[in-house]
């Protein structure tokens, strides 16, 4: 049956980690434009392969969003032609003051804006939905290159880009564990909210942090 292999190839079901030919050296951080996925298909497969290896929720829907969803920002790190890190951010906020008040009052839930809406609705901070921000959707580092500060460097570069773009903050939502909380705090993020109940999908409390 040729259909199943075709679908697997089309949706990158069988993508694995990029091969780490050399592990000595310094990773170079670079931005990725959505158009690069078409001009450099190997970059797409390596980027998606890193995400799949690190995030069990990564799905074909994420692949679709990588290709054509608006408001996405991508960056990566590379050493000796091996992709060592991948970072995916989503634009949030920028709502009108009127809509932000509706979110704060619980009457409106516009699509997206996970952290911005949560801070407005649950933390009593409607201004969070007005401010312009970017949320870390996915971040992954190749296992052969971990504990070298690559994730921290990717985030630091995006902080600088956000400042240059006039954004107000970066954010992240994650299932709380002491290790993950420490990772985000070491990157400069400050914890701003923890849910009162554990998530069924992860068994962890949902935490939110901003930079």
What are these regions (language model features)?
Residues 59-72:
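C-terminal helical "lid" subdomain and adjoining coupling/linker elements of P-loop NTPases
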């Amino acid at each position: 049956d040729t259909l199943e292999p075709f679908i697997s190839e089309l949706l990158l079901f069988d993508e694995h980690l990029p091969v780490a030919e050399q592990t000595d050296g310094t990773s170079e951080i670079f931005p990725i434009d959505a158009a690069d996925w078409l001009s450099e298909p190997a970059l797409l497969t390596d980027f998606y392969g890193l995400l799949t290896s690190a995030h069990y929720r990564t799905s074909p829907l994420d692949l679709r969003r990588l290709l054509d969803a608006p408001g996405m920002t991508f960056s990566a790190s590379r050493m000796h032609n091996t992709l060592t890190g991948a970072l995916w951010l989503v634009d949030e906020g920028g709502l009108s003051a009127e809509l932000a008040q509706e979110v704060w009052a619980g009457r409106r839930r516009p699509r997206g804006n996970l952290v911005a809406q949560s801070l407005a609705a649950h933390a009593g901070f409607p201004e969070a939905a007005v401010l312009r921000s970017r949320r870390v959707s996915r971040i992954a580092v190749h296992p052969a290159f971990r504990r070298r500060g690559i994730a921290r460097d990717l985030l630091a570069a995006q902080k600088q880009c956000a400042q240059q773009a006039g954004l107000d903050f970066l954010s992240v939502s994650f299932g709380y564990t002491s290790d993950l909380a420490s990772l985000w705090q070491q990157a400069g993020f400050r914890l701003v909210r923890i849910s009162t109940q554990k998530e069924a999908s992860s068994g962890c409390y949902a935490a939110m942090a901003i930079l």
